[in-house]
UniProtKB/Swiss-Prot annotation:
GO CC list: plasma membrane
GO molecular function, one term: NADH dehydrogenase (ubiquinone) activity
One Pfam short name: Complex1_30kDa
Classification via HAMAP family: NDH1_NuoC
Species for this entry: Dechloromonas aromatica (strain RCB)
Enzyme Commission number: 7.1.1.-
Substrates-to-products reaction catalysed: a quinone + NADH + 5 H(+)(in) = a quinol + NAD(+) + 4 H(+)(out)
Key words, A-Z: Cell inner membrane, Cell membrane, Membrane, NAD, Quinone, Translocase, Transport, Ubiquinone
Name under which the protein is recorded: NADH-quinone oxidoreductase subunit C
Amino acid sequence: MSAKLETLSQNLQEHFGDKLKSLKLALGEITIEVAAADYFCVMTALRDEAAFGFEEMIDLCGVDYSTYGDGTWQGARFAVVVHLLSVANNWRLRVRVFAEDEGFPSVASITTVWASANWFEREAFDLYGIAFVGHDDLRRILTDYGFIGHPFRKDFPISGHVEMRYDPDQARVIYQPVTIEPRENTPRIVREDTFGDTAHG
């Protein structure tokens, strides 16, 4: 671990203590996990405290951990992952918070901490259904207004629930149930006579 990351790691442990559920170093970056109840105050401190100085939030996304690693995942299903940058200290940090309720996943909004979180939180809401408590304009940003469900959830059907098409009789775009019929793909192997070792005699 570099001296810079060692300093950041010590600062995090000293300042937050038990609020850190985990602190891991991988690929030259530190990832911390905090509880949903502590998320907002931790994020505010990461921006405001001189020991951290994370003035930029560079990314925020949702994650669906169901069947994580194709094993039996015992943890919570939905998480929010935030990437922070301190230009002054030249270090980065990844913060992960799990939503406690799988039926209605929600965490605090950090739009009052970093205004740039606004559309990122709307995207995570739209694609994963994670609600951000305190967000003043939490509405869909990528899918259509009448879209049903959240398409990045692992249990969302690949073909979706409805499809849109233009109806010339009604002279407008309409929604209808998906008409794609499931099919089985048969793998085909096409080999030329000159393929592989047989081409060299």
